[in-house]
A protein has these predicted regions:
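Short Lys/Arg-rich basic patches
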Residues: 2-3
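Short helix-capping/turn signature of helix-turn-helix
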Residues: 49, 94, 107-114
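Hydrophobic alpha-helical connector segments
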Residues: 58, 69-101, 149-153
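Hydrophobic/aromatic residues within well-ordered alpha-helical segments
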Residues: 9, 52, 59, 63, ...
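Solvent-exposed, amphipathic alpha-helical segments
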Residues: 12, 16-24, 70-73, 108, ...
Length: 192
């Protein structure tokens, strides 16, 4: 067996974990399944990450970073809160059908899994960062305080994703995300 640097082994194991997540969901991620997918020795997981939980966290963090970049890239924050919220909902709807990211949204929603709960703040930070960017770009606050608007946006997404995980009906999920987008956009832009 040829030598693989620690950096390369780390990438190999993260990619293998993501592949196992896609194939088998969180329940299918075991030390053996990841090692087999990576074609790496079992001990390499503990040597590189310390534990399977640490490896799963690293893999999910990678997916969250990719989702954050994909959702935020190309949003025209100068257009205002409404168009951006609608854009977020449209992008999330597209992610539900994506093999790489669908697992993150469907299978790794916070459900009491300690590994996932540690990542919840990163997940919610995306909406807050976008709301902050919009505020800077448009020079005014939304009608709903930014932290609350970010939480409401993510709560809508979480609810639709949980329903999608239960019924697997993409048409309903897309429609519900679109409607939540319109409602939140209207509420954010409304001036009292």
């Amino acid at each position: 067996m040829s030598y693989i640097s620690a950096v390369d082994r780390k990438e190999q194991l993260i990619n293998a974990t993501i592949a196992v997540l896609q194939k088998s969901g969180i329940e299918g991620v075991t030390t053996r399944s990841v090692a087999a997918e990576a074609k790496a020795p079992l001990a390499s997981i503990h040597y590189t990450f310390g534990s399977l939980d640490d490896l799963v966290l690293a893999a999910v963090e990678r997916l969250i970073e990719e989702v954050n970049a994909w959702v935020a890239d190309g949003l025209d924050v100068k257009a205002g809160y409404g168009p951006c919220i609608i854009g977020i909902m449209e992008r999330v709807a597209g992610l539900l059908e994506d093999e790489r990211y669908g697992v993150l949204l469907r299978d790794l929603n916070p459900t009491g899994d300690r590994r996932v709960e540690k990542l919840e703040e990163k997940y919610y930070r995306l909406a807050q960062d976008i709301m902050d960017s919009i505020a800077v770009a448009v020079g005014h606050e939304p009608a709903i305080p930014r932290p609350q608007l970010a939480r409401m946006t993510m709560a809508a997404i979480d609810g639709v994703v949980l329903q999608f995980a239960a019924n697997n009906d993409i048409k309903i999920a897309r429609s519900d995300l679109a409607q939540f987008g319109l409602v939140l956009a209207d509420a954010a832009e409304r001036r009292l």
